[in-house]
Amino acid sequence: EIHERLVGSEMCIRDRLQDFTYIAHHYLPAARKRLTALLQNPPKDTASVAPELRPALLYREQLLASPVNEQNAMVRALSGGTVFPAPGGDPVLNPNVLPTGRNMYSINAENTPNPRAWEDGKRLAEATLKQYISKHGEYPRKVSYTFWAGEFINTEGATLAQVFWMLGVEPVRDAQGRVVDLKLVPSEELGRPRINVLVQVSGQLRDIAGSRLKLLTDAIRLTSEAGDETYPNYVASGTLLQEKLLVEKGTSPKRAREMSVMRVFGPVNSGYSTGMMAYTEHSGSWESEKEIAEGYLNNMGASYGDDENWGDVQEGLFASALSETDVVIQPRQSNTWGPISLDHVYEFTGGLSLTVKTVTSKEPDAYMADYRNRTNRRMQDAKEAIAVETRSTILNPTFIQERMKGGEGSAQMFGEIFRNIFGWHVMRPSAMDKELFNDLYRMYIKDENKLGIHEYFLRVNPAAFQAMTAVMLESARKGYWKASDEQLKTTASLHAQITREKGAACTEFVCDNDKLQSFVADQLDNSEKQTYTQNMKEVHEASATDGKDVVLKEHKLTSEQTVRKNRVNGVVAGSLVVITFIGLVVLLKKRKKNK
């Protein structure tokens, strides 16, 4: 509506409307006020409500009905009744998931990419190439993608379509719309080189879309053998290079040729994680980012391309497949998370970027494939995406004030974002604003906006604040934050104060990093240093004595309450099991008597 009203004006363009910060500062307050008033006092007659606002009333009713629907559906399921199906997903993106309390389904993987997803994927692939060419003046040789189950389901295969179009193949469908084969797009029709690809998958995606990963390997074989090309075929040349690198690593020529078309990789041992988040945050245990990359190669090096080699780990294969990578791409389809609020983004795409840089000695470009706006899919530079989320959330006083209305969980969210920021600095420091830590220092350590930051965290969740200060100090120790002596002293003093007054919450940063503890102590004056050192010594001794994690003072009561609550829940659950068992016995006896 706003776009149509301002068409032809420099005040507003479609891409700018998609920028969250622009909407937040110019239109969101008024829209929120109008919607809030409507939802708090809904009229009995909706005819007086503007047509564009009527869906909000429907969604309100469906949300209010959802808890009862969920309870009724559970009882109906336990009674052997039918739980009716409905799509699952983000209600912001797809309101059809409301009301909840129905049997969620995702998609039929065999139909992917569906026709709409195919067109979306083609557009995003071309947008990727256009963006890369505008910066580098040439086509990329290889693009490496991250595939997640959520994005695959929500876009109905648009992520897969991007890869197919990069290769220059298109789907062949049967009468039921299933994608059963692929065919080459002629080189003249494609009008550009065939771009080589690599795909890393999450465990969930591997489990629900195994047939699509095998189809992708078929696409690699098909394009590697394409002849009479008008334009370069980077897939074919990449396959030959991969074979050559494997032979150089000691693989037999026959095996090297067989594995040269493998481009799909994921967690080893049929796992579900890169395993790199904990290692990254245990930063006292590694000195160089190359150690992180080596761990990534080991943990994500299982191939998932065909039945014969499903889950196999071939030494040197993943590294050889990463060669020549010019771009890494992360899908994004939800408004509920961003690159700094979800740790899996730095874990997967950040980890992939670092590993490519380690293998090729060149950092690839990094983009987000943004599916959030169904009418305007777009590619966004990772640095821009991080900056937008950073400025609109963790450095936004209004956002911070709203989050501070919450309790322990809200405070914990800040700590998680700080850890993710550290993770990005480890994996891809070029994506981070050089002034970010200084901005965080002014916002949280100095509280220059007078938000009551210290009072809030010390009251609600001192462990989160302790972790935040520890992350900043570890970032300085590692060289990611070029802090001044004053900044270091102030941050270390605050960290020591929390430890002195509240105890030490033994997270990876606070208790498990002896090098950081020495670094913190070196920033303190003699009296603070002595007290801090003694506090940490007592924590380690206590942990060694009882073998249990140390909890902050304010959290002990919560833990006891949790234990009591769990006991009550256990009694209730046990009673339900007994009652159910008795009921089954009675039912069986009745059936036996009737026979």
Where are these regions (language model features)?
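Single conserved hydrophobic/aromatic residue that forms the stacking wall/gate
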Residues: 1-8
